[in-house]
C-alpha cells in the first residue's frame, strides 16, 4: 500500500478549502464573543470514563479507544466536545451564575455518519449553563441561526422537537419501556411498518400515540394536531407548551415541528432543534437541552447548546475566490523591507518571489506588483 494513502473517510484539507474553513471559524467565534461566550479548548484525549460520562451508547461506539502508556487506563479520542465542555463548567469553573462557553476543534469518529461524511469533523459550538428557562433555549437557537447567516446560509429551516413527548409515552407503558432504544431508532427513521410490529402488544393509547408521531411534522399547527392525537399526559402537555413558546420566541425564523426528529435523544432532556438548508437531507446544525450531563461530574446544571461541523459548512459554500496579493521581488534592502512591512501591517498580502519562481501564484492572485522607481518602491497594477 502506498505510504501516502490515508484511512477511509479521512482527508487532508488543501489550501482553498482550508482558507474557507478558517475564515468561517473566525467569523463564527467572533460572533459568539459578541454574545458574551467565552472560548474554551478541551483536550483531544481524555480518560474514557470521563469522556463518555452522561453520553449514550451511540457515543461509545463512535469513540476511538487506546491504552495510556503511563497509567494503563483506557483513553478515548473525543467524538464530541459537548461532554468535555460540561465537565469544564461543572468541575473546573464551578460558577454559581450563568456561564456561556464556546469551543472549536477536531473530533474523531470510528465510523462516518453518512456515505461521504468525514470521520474527522471540525466541530464548533456554544453552550449556556445555569439557566433552566426557555430564554436560554431561545438564545441558543438565535445564535445558531445567526452563525449560519454569517456563513451565508439565510434560507434555512429551524426544526423543533422535544424528548419529553416520547419519554412521557414510554413511562406510561411498561412494554414500551423495554423497547426504548428500538423505538427511538424506528421513530428517527419514520419506519411505520416496523413501529406497527413492535407496538402490537402495547396499550392502545401508547400504540396510537407512537404511530402518530412520524406524521406529526409541519408548521406550528402540528402542535394543535398533537394535542388532539396524543394522550393528555403531563409530560406531553409540558413539552408541547414549551415548543409553542419557543416557536413564538423564534421571531421571523422559518420554524417547523417534527416530533420524530429525535437526534440526541439519549442525553437530551428537553427541547431539541435541527437546522436544515435547502437541498440537503441532513441537518447542518443540531442542539438542545441536556440538563443531566453535569451530574456525572458531581454538579448537575441546567444546560443547552448547539454544534456544527465547519468542514461540512465550508463544503456547501461556493469555491473561494483567489485572494488578491501584491508581488514583490526578493531582496533584503532596508527600503524594500520597510515598504513590505508597512503593507503587511495595513492588511495587504505581499508575496516575495523567490529567484526563478517569479510567476508562481498558487492560492493567491497577484494583481499588483511592487516596483522601484526613482529610488522609491511603489505599487503598480498588473494586466
Curated annotation (Swiss-Prot):
The keyword Methyltransferase does not apply. One of its GO terms (biological process) is L-histidine biosynthetic process. Pfam families: tRNA-synt_His. GO terms for cellular component: cytoplasm. Keywords: Amino-acid biosynthesis, Cytoplasm, Histidine biosynthesis. Its main location: cytoplasm. Disulfide bonds: none annotated. The keyword Amino-acid biosynthesis applies. Pathway: Amino-acid biosynthesis; L-histidine biosynthesis; L-histidine from 5-phospho-alpha-D-ribose 1-diphosphate: step 1/9. Gene3D superfamilies: Bira Bifunctional Protein, Domain 2 (3.30.930.10). Heteromultimer composed of HisG and HisZ subunits. Required for the first step of histidine biosynthesis. May allow the feedback regulation of ATP phosphoribosyltransferase activity by histidine. Belongs to the class-II aminoacyl-tRNA synthetase family. HisZ subfamily. This function is generally fulfilled by the C-terminal part of HisG, which is missing in some bacteria such as this one. This is ATP phosphoribosyltransferase regulatory subunit. It comes from Janthinobacterium sp. (strain Marseille).
Amino acid at each position: 500500500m502506498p505510504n501516502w494513502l490515508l484511512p477511509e473517510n479521512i482527508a487532508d484539507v488543501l489550501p482553498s478549502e482550508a482558507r474557507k474553513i478558517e475564515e468561517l471559524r473566525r467569523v463564527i467565534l467572533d460572533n459568539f464573543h459578541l454574545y458574551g461566550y467565552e472560548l474554551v479548548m478541551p483536550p483531544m484525549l481524555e480518560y474514557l470514563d470521563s469522556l463518555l460520562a452522561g453520553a449514550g451508547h451511540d457515543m461509545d461506539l463512535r469513540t476511538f479507544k487506546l491504552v495510556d502508556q503511563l497509567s494503563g487506563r483506557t483513553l478515548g479520542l473525543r467524538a464530541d466536545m459537548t461532554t468535555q465542555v460540561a465537565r469544564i463548567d461543572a468541575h473546573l469553573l464551578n460558577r454559581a451564575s450563568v456561564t456561556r462557553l464556546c469551543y472549536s476543534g477536531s473530533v474523531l469518529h470510528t465510523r462516518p455518519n453518512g456515505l461521504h461524511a468525514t470521520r474527522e469533523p471540525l466541530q464548533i459550538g456554544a453552550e449556556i449553563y445555569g439557566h433552566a428557562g426557555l430564554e436560554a433555549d431561545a438564545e441558543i437557537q438565535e445564535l445558531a441561526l445567526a452563525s449560519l447567516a454569517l456563513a451565508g446560509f439565510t434560507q434555512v429551516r429551524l426544526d423543533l422537537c422535544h424528548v419529553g413527548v416520547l419519554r412521557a409515552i414510554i413511562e406510561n407503558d411498561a412494554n414500551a419501556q423495554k423497547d426504548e432504544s428500538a423505538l427511538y431508532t424506528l421513530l428517527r427513521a419514520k419506519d411505520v411498518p416496523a413501529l406497527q410490529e413492535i407496538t402490537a402488544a402495547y396499550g392502545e393509547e401508547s400504540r396510537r400515540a407512537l404511530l402518530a408521531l412520524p406524521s406529526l411534522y409541519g408548521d406550528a399547527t402540528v402542535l394543535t394536531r398533537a394535542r388532539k392525537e396524543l394522550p393528555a399526559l403531563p409530560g406531553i402537555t409540558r413539552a408541547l407548551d414549551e415548543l409553542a413558546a419557543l416557536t413564538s420566541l423564534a421571531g421571523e425564523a422559518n420554524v417547523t415541528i417534527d416530533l420524530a426528529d429525535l437526534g440526541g435523544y439519549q442525553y437530551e432532556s428537553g427541547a431539541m432543534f435541527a437546522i436544515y438548508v435547502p437541498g440537503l437531507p441532513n441537518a447542518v446544525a443540531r442542539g438542545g437541552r441536556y440538563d443531566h450531563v453535569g451530574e456525572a461530574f458531581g454538579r448537575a446544571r441546567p444546560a443547552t447548546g448547539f454544534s456544527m461541523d465547519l468542514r461540512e459548512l465550508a463544503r456547501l459554500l461556493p469555491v473561494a475566490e483567489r485572494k488578491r496579493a501584491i508581488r514583490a521581488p526578493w531582496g533584503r534592502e532596508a527600503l524594500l523591507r520597510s515598504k513590505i512591512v508597512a503593507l503587511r501591517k495595513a492588511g495587504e498580502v505581499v508575496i516575495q518571489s523567490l529567484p526563478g519562481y517569479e510567476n508562481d501564484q498558487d492560492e493567491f492572485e497577484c494583481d499588483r506588483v511592487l516596483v522601484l522607481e526613482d529610488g522609491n518602491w511603489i505599487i503598480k497594477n498588473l494586466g
